[in-house]
Regions:
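Bacterial N-terminal signal peptides that target proteins for export
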Residues: 1-9
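Interaction-surface and assembly-scaffold signal
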Residues: 136-260
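C-terminal segment of classical bacterial N-terminal signal peptides
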Residues: 14-24
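Aromatic- and glycine-enriched beta-alpha-beta binding-site module
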Residues: 83-163
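Generic structural hydrophobic/aromatic packing signal, biased to beta-strands
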Residues: 14, 42, 76-79, 102-104, ...
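N-terminal domain-onset segments
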Residues: 27-82, 212-244, 250, 257-260
Length: 260
């Protein structure tokens, strides 16, 4: 069933799968970084008016019209970077990192382009503040993950993330799920900044994608899901009316990052 949705949800949960060999960029590019990561993406539906305030003109909120994250208008993207390399292949910024990104699926009102807009995030490394998108702040990030399996059978994973800001606010998420064969695919996409609406970076990725839960698609291999958000800047989004749309795990996420 997962393969029916191959073109819906790769980069930040809403990318478009493409074949790199058939994609010829129309702009000059400069490689700035390469990474090896694992990720967890939680797609949610929150109040449209509240989330629109996070997105600058000329962007507006543009939830996916179909697929496993249909109508999701806010994404938590939890990223565990196992290796970070500069353009010469040397360890960059310490060589590893963990952080969380807040992403809103956007639609450009003038061009019609649809792309993720990064509206915020947390990083433990002050060197990454405010980050390339000028929206990241410093916080502490903890991840606890266990995987249990035997022989050739699919295993069971327990993934817990805790993010704390300097004022005592937190984001906590736990997902326990039955693993399945992941979908391997490639994607390319531009991702924009809420702080500088015209700024973008170009991402080329190769991923192994495990769709854990999709309410629109009727898929559910999640045995336990908990999300708790107490950060003041997110209180208008998480007022008790938010709804889960889907959860995606990326046991492997390889990417190259370019500037135009």
């Amino acid at each position: 069933m997962l393969y029916r949705y191959i073109a819906v949800f790769l980069i930040l949960g809403i990318g478009l799968v493409e074949n790199f060999s058939s994609t010829q960029p129309c702009w000059a590019e400069t490689l700035v970084q390469s990474t090896v990561e694992t990720r967890l993406v939680v797609g949610l539906r929150v109040g449209q008016a509240a989330v629109q305030k996070l997105v600058p003109t000329p962007w507006q909120v543009g939830p996916p019209p179909g697929g496993p994250l249909k109508d999701a208008n806010f994404m938590f993207v939890f990223i565990d970077q196992l290796l970070v390399q500069d353009p010469q292949g040397k360890p960059d910024m310490g060589g590893g990192n963990r952080y969380v990104v807040f992403s809103v699926p956007g639609k450009h009102t003038q061009t019609g382009e649809m792309a993720p807009v990064v509206t915020g995030g947390f990083t433990p490394d002050i060197r990454n503040v405010p980050g390339p998108y000028k929206v990241s702040v410093q916080g502490t990030i903890k991840r606890e993950q266990t995987n249990k399996g035997a022989n050739t059978e699919a295993g069971v994973s327990d993934d817990f993330w805790e993010i704390r800001d300097t004022r005592g606010g937190s984001i906590e998420v736990r997902v326990q799920y039955q693993q399945a064969l992941p979908l391997r695919a490639k994607a390319e996409q531009k991702i924009y900044s809420a702080a500088e609406p015209s700024f973008f970076r170009i991402y080329r990725t190769e991923t192994a994608t495990d769709l854990l839960r999709s309410i629109p698609a009727g898929i559910n291999r999640v045995q336990n899901y908990q999300l708790r958000v107490t950060m003041p800047e997110l209180k208008n989004l998480f007022d008790g009316s938010e709804q889960l749309v889907g959860i995606i795990a990326y046991p492997l996420f390889l990417r190259q990052i370019f500037l135009p």
